[in-house]
Every structure is written in structure tokens, then in C-alpha cells.
Amino acid sequence: MRSEMTLTSTNSAEALAAQDFANTVLSAAAPGFHADCETPAMATPATPTVAQFVIQGSTICLVC
């Protein structure tokens, strides 16, 4: 049951829209760490930004 719910939720229009938004915003990201917070990077500094975009506006159960 849970695997069916996971497959359905990952293919939902909302999930795909969130992924597209995050990919569009961070399309200029470069590998490595940058000291400038305005420069997107595919390292730890970029991770909270992606999480913020994906989590904002949706409900996620961390207990399940």
C-alpha cells in the first residue's frame, strides 16, 4: 500500500511542478563550494534551497 502511494505521489502534477521549479531556479548551479551565497552550487549550500522549494506549500509526514 505504501509503495503504491509513493509511486502515485512522485508522479503527481504538484511533485513534477516542484521539481521543474527547483531545476529551473538552480539550472546555473556549478559543482563545488562557493563563498558567495548568491552563486548556486551543487554542494551543501544549495541543498537547503532545494528543500525549501520542495517543502514549501505541501504537507509531508515525517513520522510515516
From Swiss-Prot:
A cellular-component GO term for this protein: extraorganismal space
Residues with PTM L-allo-isoleucine: 55, 60
This protein's UniProt keywords: Antibiotic, Antimicrobial, D-amino acid, Methylation, Secreted, Thioether bond
Modification after translation, per record: Maturation involves the enzymatic conversion of Cys-61 into 2,3-didehydroalanine followed by formation of a thioether bond with Cys-64. The C-terminal meso-lanthionine then undergoes decarboxylation. Dimethylated at the N-terminus. Dimethylation is required for antibiotic activity.
GO biological process, one term: defense response to Gram-positive bacterium
Cross-link (S-(2-aminovinyl)-D-cysteine (Cys-Cys)): 61-64
Subcellular compartments: Secreted
Propeptide residues per the UniProt entry: 1-42
N,N-dimethylalanine PTM sites in chain numbering: 43
Secreted recorded as keyword: yes
Annotated positions of the (E)-2,3-didehydrobutyrine modification: 44, 47, 49, 59
Record bears the keyword rRNA-binding: no
Function text: Antibiotic peptide structurally related to lantibiotics. Active against M.luteus (MIC=0.2 ug/ml). Has cytotoxic activity against mouse P388 leukemia cells (IC(50)=1.3 ug/ml).
Family statement drawn from the similarity comment of this UniProt entry: Belongs to the linaridin family.
Name of the protein in question: Cypemycin
Name of the gene this protein is made from: cypA
